[in-house]
UniProtKB/Swiss-Prot annotation:
BP term (GO), one: defense response
Species for this entry: Arabidopsis thaliana
Intervals holding LRR repeats: 515-536, 537-559, 562-584, 586-608, 609-631, 632-654
Matching SUPFAM superfamilies: L domain-like (SSF52058), P-loop containing nucleoside triphosphate hydrolases (SSF52540)
Secreted among keywords: no
Protein name: Putative disease resistance protein At4g10780
């Protein structure tokens, strides 16, 4: 029964579809004659409409106007459909002759059906085209490249404009990005480019300026471009984005255009807008400004031009221009005060303009003193600062989508003005503050920290500093913006008190200690800290770098139960901690490095939440007894302190089951062996200094290092060792897996029995290598050890190319050294080799292809006779490196 029902349904469906198909086919054939007549009538109407439109267009063009693009597109479509109509009409007689049975059938059903369908569809298309042919406006004034208003060229900006212009004129450049912090002058530079195009033309048909801003809307950009191209009216406005894109594409494809996009915050999809590709052949250009390097990359610009702040001299010239010579000369002291005010702007044109204009009418010296005071203490209160400067810079802060990234940015404002901040220190703070989840593991957390720093650098909120970019710096005006956001835009100034580097001698008075969440008094001259402030909300306390600080009273810490970060480092006179530090029950970060503290209070063991403890460079600290009670500890710094580790100390360290990072000095073979036996400790070591290892006569003087995955820095000094081996490996095992993957710095001094350092093959990421006073060292990498294995093992060794990341190689007082490596190496990152008192080193592992093209390289030496004795691989190598050699006095 079920099968019969199914069959019935299937038959019904087949019949229905067959009927529908036959009905459609019949209509196309049966009504063919009528449809041809209807099509002829529709074409006649369309032609009449076209003639009317053309007549109007010709009249307007006679007045000097230019037909609208939408009119031109419509006329083009009319011509296309008319041509298609005449092609279709040419087959009319043949198709009509095929009709039979009173036009109900055809002698060629397939041909008649196809022809009839084309006629029917063309009627609809012609009627639709005709209905769209009624334009309110058919022509408008031709678009002109109008000058954009701009201030006179700022002193010092001529060079970057010329660079930008030269790059724009390069036929190989299609898209150019200008990036920099807010207020630095990107829009001004783009305006200069626009106006220069107006003056010079340079064969450009049209220049289009669009302000994009943070609220990116494709349809808004299309409207701005469409208006410039003559696409206006209701019909254009009603079109979908994709239809507008086609119109823009068709129009711009016939022109040489320059599109200027100002202030973009995310990738602009040029294809969606309808912008043709920019090629060497069409010489079209797109130029944009942004505050983000990420945006440059997403726009396909991998070599953008940075617009930087003005130099000190150029900034002063701009500031003088804004203030005027009458005000500057109205009192003898004003000129010096004006230089201080200008200096607070740190070369940022936006700040120089706003503050300069504000001070233009100030002729009383007291007003200038007041300006310096306000800009030093709380710049947000300076007239015009919040609305015209900080608010503009705050857009960059608002564009940071993650709240933790915003908190990390604000944290940098706790440092003094123009201060270089170590990256690793910031990341340690952020982990302890909870901005980064420390539970994911130290390495992953640190990587996340570097990702956040990269985000802030690419957003032009921080800049990288130092040769190896290990530090960051915050522009002073950006810092003021960060402090402004920390104070809830000035509504709660005591929420975050920052008087870092202010020359304080004592803790400042605060009206409402209960509101304070972050307090930075670092880098001052505070001598004593006393009192008992009620700070129930305080989470961060920076007291480091108060080099005169001798004493902190116990009462000071009594009401800080939410304190998470306490930094007391580099208080060189501080000789003790109060017992009340145990009341900091939420403390996670404590830095006592570079202090004069002799002993840790026993109550320190009560800090059960502490995860980061830095005791490095505490020259008077004698013991870490009880350290094992800090059950949450993950990072412990002991390097360069006075602690003499013994067996009991190592046992205590071994009890720290959550320990991930350890920096330490090892001065005893017994302690070293004990730590090697406690393998988990070796895996935690990040920085290790091995000093004064002395072996008994019956002891093997080989140093067997275990694998240390976390090790980043290794220093060895004055050790009686004859050879360094990797404990897990010998030279006849597979060496292709690095044992010291993270090791980047190796310094070895006064180890007189070492003959080679072949173990360095297992440290592929070394960037800095210093070898000094190794009297018996003959080869850096031993040829015999590295090749004296089986053929299969040699093939494995050949996969290791040493020193691929090495940047600096320092060789000093190595009287027997003859070889660094037996063949030439590529050294792609090498920037310098320093050679002193290495008389037997005649050959260097260099050839004419060594080093990165364009990278600065210097070969420094102390003795002229040494460089004259060097045996270069060939003449090309000699010519390649001799210009880079430099005679210097190297201080060992």
């Amino acid at each position: 029964m079920g099968s019969c029902i199914s069959l019935q349904i299937s038959c019904d469906q087949v019949l229905t579809r067959a009927y529908s198909c036959f009905f459609s086919l019949g209509n196309y054939i049966h009504k063919l004659k009528d449809n041809i007549v209807a099509l002829e009538k529709a074409i006649e109407d369309l032609t009449a409409t076209r003639d009317d439109v053309l007549r109007r267009v010709q009249m307007e063009e006679g007045k000097g106007l230019e037909r609208l693009q939408q009119v031109q597109v419509w006329l083009k479509r009319v011509e296309i459909i008319r041509n298609q109509f005449y092609d279709l009409l040419s087959a009319r007689n043949i198709e009509i002759q095929r009709l039979c049975f009173y036009s109900n059938c055809s002698t060629n059903l397939s041909s008649s059906y196809t022809y009839g369908q084309r006629v029917f569809l063309m009627i609809k298309e012609v009627e639709n085209l005709n209905s769209n042919g009624f334009f309110e406006i058919v022509a408008a004034p031709a678009p002109k490249l109008e000058m954009r208003p701009i201030q006179p060229t700022i002193m010092g900006r001529e060079t970057i404009f010329q660079r930008a212009w030269n790059r724009l004129m390069d036929d190989g450049v299609g898209t150019m990005g200008l990036y920099g912090m807010g207020g630095v002058g990107k829009t001004t530079l783009l305006t200069q480019i626009h106006n220069t195009l107006h003056d010079t033309k340079n064969g450009v048909d049209i220049v289009i300026w669009v302000v994009v801003s943070s609220d990116l809307q494709i349809h808004k950009i299309q409207e701005d471009i469409g208006e410039k191209l003559g696409f206006i009216g209701k019909e254009w406005n009603k079109k979908q984005e994709s239809q507008k894109a086609v119109d823009i594409l068709n129009c711009l494809s016939k022109k040489r255009f320059v599109l200027l996009l100002d202030d973009i915050w995310k990738k602009v999809d040029l294809t969606k807008i309808g912008i043709p590709s920019q090629t060497r052949e069409n010489k079209c250009k797109v130029v944009f400004t942004t505050r983000s390097l990420d945006v440059c990359a997403r726009m396909g610009v991998h070599d953008p031009m940075e617009v930087q702040c003005l130099s000190t001299n150029d900034a002063w010239e701009l500031f003088q221009e804004k203030v005027g010579q009458i005000s500057l000369g109205s009192h003898p002291d004003i000129l010096e005060l004006a230089k201080k005010v200008a200096g607070k702007c740190r070369g940022l044109p936006l700040a120089l303009n706003v503050i300069g204009e504000t001070m233009a009418g100030k002729r009383a010296v007291q007003e200038w003193h007041h300006a310096v005071d306000v800009l030093t203490s709380y710049a947000a209160e300076f007239s015009g600062m919040d609305d015209h400067i900080l608010l503009i810079l705050k857009y960059s802060y608002d564009n940071l989508n993650d709240k933790h990234v915003r908190s990390c940015f604000q944290y940098c404002a706790l440092y003094p003005e123009d201060y270089s901040i170590k990256k690793y220190r910031l990341i340690d703070y952020w982990i302890c503050e909870g901005f980064i989840d420390g539970n994911i593991g130290k390495e992953r957390a640190v990587n996340q920290g570097y990702e956040i720093l990269g985000t802030l650098v690419r957003a032009c909120l921080l800049s990288e500093e130092g040769k190896n970019k290990l530090e960051v710096k915050m522009h002073d005006v950006v810092r003021e913006m960060a402090l402004w956001t920390l104070s809830d835009l000035g509504k709660n100034k005591e929420r975050c008190i920052v008087q870092a580097g202010s020359g304080l001698r004592k803790v400042p008075k605060v009206e409402d200690w209960g509101a304070v969440r972050r307090l930075s008094l670092m880098n001052n001259g505070i001598e004593e800290i006393s009192g008992s402030p009620e700070c129930p909300e305080l989470t961060t306390l920076f007291l480091q770098e108060n080099k005169s600080l001798v004493h902190i009273s116990g009462e000071f810490f009594r009401h800080m139960r939410k304190l998470v970060v306490l930094d007391l480092s580099e208080n060189h006179q501080l000789d003790g901690l109060p017992e009340q530090i145990s009341e900091l029950v939420a403390l996670r970060y404590l830095d006592l490095s570079h202090t004069n503290i002799e002993g840790l209070p026993a109550c320190l063991q009560d800090l059960k939440t502490l995860i980061h403890l830095n005791l490095e460079c505490m020259r008077r600290l004698g013991s870490i007894a009880g350290i094992s009670k800090l059950s949450s500890l993950r990072t412990l710094g002991l390097r360069n302190s006075n602690i003499m580790l013994d067996v009991m100390s190592v046992k205590e360290l071994h009890l720290l089951e959550h320990l991930e990072i350890l920096t330490i000095d090892i001065v005893s073979t017994m302690v070293l062996e004990q730590m090697i036996d406690a393998g988990t400790l070796m895996n935690c070591m990040q920085e290790v200094s091995i000093r004064c290892l002395i072996y008994d006569q019956e002891q093997d003087t080989k140093l067997r290092l275990p694998t240390m995955d976390s090790l980043r820095s290794l220093t060895m000094w004055n050790c009686e060792i004859s050879e360094i081996e990797i404990e897990r490996l010998t030279w006849n095992t597979n060496p292709t897996s690095p044992c010291f993957f993270n090791l980047s710095q190796v310094i070895i001094h006064v180890c007189s029995s070492l003959k080679d350092l072949t173990w360095l093959l297992f440290a592929p990421n070394i960037t800095y290598l210093m070898i000094e006073q190794l009297e018996q060292l003959q080869e850096l990498i031993s040829h015999a050890k590295a090749t004296g294995v089986t053929e299969e093992e040699q093939q494995q060794l050949h996969k290791i190319i040493p020193f691929q990341k090495l940047q600096i190689l320092h060789l000093s007082s190595l009287p027997e050294l003859k070889s660094i490596y037996w063949i030439s190496l590529s050294f792609p990152c090498l920037s310098g080799i320093y050679v002193e008192r290495c008389p037997k080193l005649r050959k260097l592992p260099l050839d004419s292809k060594t080093g990165t093209v364009g990278k600065k390289f210097v070969l420094q030496y102390k003795e002229t006779e040494w460089i004259e004795s060097v045996e270069w691989k060939d003449e090309a190598t000699k010519l390649h490196f001799l210009p880079s050699t430099k005679l210097v006095y190297i201080l060992s």
